[in-house]
């Protein structure tokens, strides 16, 4: 099913909020997300800002990774919920390149040549900033 960008964004935010709430985190939502900040979560060290990038992952024989593109945002973290093998997962990664456009790929399967060096496997990025 194809969703428009707004619908995907709302679905993604709700997935991330629900996950954080199951961890007993205090989650806040800005009145307006003009600056690319969708959520604010309280951590041990204060507050972290989150931008949510929903991904409609369609795993096929030829597609074995998820590409995430980030526009200029001041968010501390990027959270990307996606569905794989009937389970919803969330990729969390620190936004070290804030205020710049950039992209990152995450492998959802092991390469056929068993290469592991310099590959971002999604399962290495499942820990949220409150865990």
Give the location of each predicted region.
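Mixed-charge (Asp/Glu-Lys/Arg
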Residues: 1-35, 40-131
